[in-house]
Amino acid sequence: GGLARLEKIIKQHEPNYVLLELGGNDALRGYPPKKISSNLVDMINIIEISNANIFLMQIRIPPNYGSRYRKAFESIYPRITETTSAILIPFMLEEVALNADLMLPDGIHPKETAQPLIAEFMYLQLKPLLTESN
């Protein structure tokens, strides 16, 4: 879905910054990590044409997907940032996901009470990068 919509959105909004936080749902559906990686790289290529600064968020998936798939999936994010202009941002739910009180019963999505923690985390991650690029 994201790849199909991205070019139109980039042309419409002409952003200076783009944060890609995608791939998790594809992983939860068991899509091949190589395909997810290819889609993310295609998206980054579209964004690079617009000269926007690109941040790519590391995505993690639950351990019940098996260590082999999990490692293959989670390793695509650092690899992509080694070969593109995207800057890797740590997974925003790293601390939140470990606290059941902050997560919905599905164990994947955060509760409303987690939002201030996520906002603070994102602020701390992005502020130095935004300041650096201005």
Predicted regions and their residues:
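Alpha-helical cap/lid subdomain in secreted, periplasmic
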Residues: 4-134
